[in-house]
């Protein structure tokens, strides 16, 4: 289930963002978190596993005109590689339902994942 991050979930977000390979240190993680929080057209979404109730995936998205750009996709270590494709398809469908008026697209770094999810959905 996709949920939009609340202010009181910053530690969860910072923890998941720290697994992102493009954020080298805690200062970079904090800057990225602050960047998302500084504009209402940006959201951080968390995927809550329905069985464990753990937050297992973080998505950083930005609404740009009629598009939703998926800027970050971060899986927690508890998500096995073999689960990522299936989970990605479920997340893609949930994003379509949550943002029905938006075209879903990836950034330069996430486009290949978004395209794979789109082709399989």
Predicted regions and their residues:
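Short amphipathic alpha-helix that is part of the acyltransferase structural core
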Residues: 1-28
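Short, basic/aromatic recognition patches
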Residues: 27-35
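Conserved beta-hairpin
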Residues: 40-57
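Conserved GNAT-family N-acetyltransferase fold
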Residues: 56-59, 73
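Conserved acetyl-CoA binding element of GNAT-fold acetyltransferases
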Residues: 66-78
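Conserved acetyl-CoA-binding loop-helix of GNAT-fold acetyltransferases
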Residues: 80-97
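Conserved GNAT acetyl-CoA-binding A-motif
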Residues: 96-112, 118-119
């Amino acid at each position: 289930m996709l949920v939009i991050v609340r202010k009181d979930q910053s530690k969860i977000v910072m923890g998941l963002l720290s697994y992102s390979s493009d954020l080298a240190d805690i200062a970079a993680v904090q800057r990225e978190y602050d960047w998302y929080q500084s504009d209402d057209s940006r959201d951080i979404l968390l995927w809550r596993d329905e069985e464990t109730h753990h937050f297992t995936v973080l998505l950083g998205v930005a609404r740009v005109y009629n598009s939703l750009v998926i800027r970050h996709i971060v899986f927690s270590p508890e998500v096995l590689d073999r689960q990522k494709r299936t989970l990605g398809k479920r997340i893609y469908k949930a994003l379509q339902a949550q943002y029905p008026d938006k075209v879903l697209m990836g950034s330069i770094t996430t486009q290949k994942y978004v395209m794979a999810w789109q082709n399989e959905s």
